[in-house]
């Protein structure tokens, strides 16, 4: 699952996404939020989708014992010598599960001097 999530996360960063949306019904649908709009990325069969969802819940310390309770979590993710802070929201439903990952620092670092040069 690590490699699969790394691929998804890398593609989200390349697309300048602020959020990654995962919705598991009879299949897993993944969408990226780019400039406020949801853009479809990939779909997976239900068994693979359930594994991805469980991986994300585990990484973000979401309690799997509370299946019908909305929860939040977070984790750090290292990619290409950069650490990303990810906030995770989990929303269960009667016939679906949804996870949204907010990428909190997906921009380049700007120094004070660089800010003062911006007109």
Where would I find each of the regions flagged by the language model?
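N-terminal "pre-motor" subdomain/linker immediately upstream of P-loop NTPase catalytic cores
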Residues: 1-119
């Amino acid at each position: 699952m690590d490699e699969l999530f790394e691929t998804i996360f890398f593609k989200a960063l390349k697309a300048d996404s602020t959020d990654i949306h995962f919705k598991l019904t009879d299949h897993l649908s993944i969408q990226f939020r780019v400039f406020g709009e949801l853009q479809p990325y990939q779909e997976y069969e239900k068994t693979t989708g359930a594994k991805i969802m469980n991986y994300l819940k585990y990484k973000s310390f979401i309690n799997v014992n509370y299946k019908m309770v909305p929860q939040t979590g977070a984790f750090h993710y290292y990619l290409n010598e950069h650490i990303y802070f990810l906030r995770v929201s989990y929303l269960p439903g009667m016939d679906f599960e949804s996870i949204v990952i907010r990428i909190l620092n997906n921009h380049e670092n700007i120094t004070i001097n660089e800010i003062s040069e911006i007109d």
